[in-house]
Amino acid sequence: MFSKKLSHLSLSLIALIGVMLFSSCGEGSTEEITNQDSNISVDTEKPDNSAQRVAAVKHIFQTIPSPIEMAELIRKSGADFDAALMNSTDNMEKYTNVRQQAVNLGVYGADLSYASMFEQQQQSIYYLSAARGLAKQLGVEDAIDNDLIERVNDNRTSRDSLVQIVADAYYNLNGYLKESDREQVSALVIAGGWIEGLYLATSHVTSDNDKLKERIAEQKYSLKDLIALLDTYEGVPELGNIIQDMKGIQTLFENVKIKKGKTETSRDTEGRMMIGSSNTITISDETLEAIKTKIQDVRNQYIQ
């Protein structure tokens, strides 16, 4: 099996690409890879919903920290890899309906990123296998094939190239979901990945790790866009109570205060223009603990 031949670097890259790709398998535009359904043509009968989905997914991925960044922040906290935090691959057999399979595909994708970031190669192989198993049950098992892996390895130093690779993969997924009217699947995958990512981050955060606390606080933005995305599928049976669950988490994030700073420009060592801004973020220990408890409760509902 090809996964046995991968180095931990390759697995880490596959984890990143996998999360991005599976998040893309339902709705969007071909303009950007972060547009969730670029693979799927725009539904002209619902132009407003299509536009909302594209915008929501774009914003979600703009505010989610990369696996590499999150791993660095977790490591700086002094935390060690904890396999017990991940959703056991033994649970995969329990997931028999579309909602369970899609949400936990996102969960396993986040766990795969977590394991590979800590160079846990054997764990990474297990979780890659679990993710592919759920993808097969959902009918999107060809999303990560050997050609994609080779392209990822060839372009591993260029994030822009990786993004383009996922954009190209959009087209391969069009038939899987559009023809069977399952566009909501991708939204559930994104939700699962978001839930697990926040769960892992809050499980490692400490009172003195300000950077990790800030990144957790900033998920206030991605959660808003995630809810906007899910709202476009309101009434679709497969979603169940996930919108209400996300809004319950959002209520706690209302206590997070983020004041945007002045936008500044600079150049990196290669002379490229860099644009950024510094924000003032306020999140109390009480709010952080409440978010941690809530995300754990919600997450446990979906992995059991």
Question: Locations of the language-model features?
Answer:
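Bacterial N-terminal signal peptides that target proteins for export
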Residues: 2-12
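C-terminal motif of bacterial Sec signal peptides marking the signal peptidase cleavage site
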Residues: 20-24
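Bacterial lipoprotein signal-peptidase II cleavage site
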Residues: 25-33
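N-terminal Sec/ER secretory leader and immediately downstream segment
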Residues: 34-151
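Secondary-structure edge/capping motif, primarily at the C-terminal ends of alpha-helices
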Residues: 112-119, 138, 142, 176-180, ...
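Short, charged, amphipathic alpha-helical segments
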Residues: 125-130, 149-150, 188-189, 213-217, ...
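Extended amphipathic alpha-helical interaction segments
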Residues: 158-243
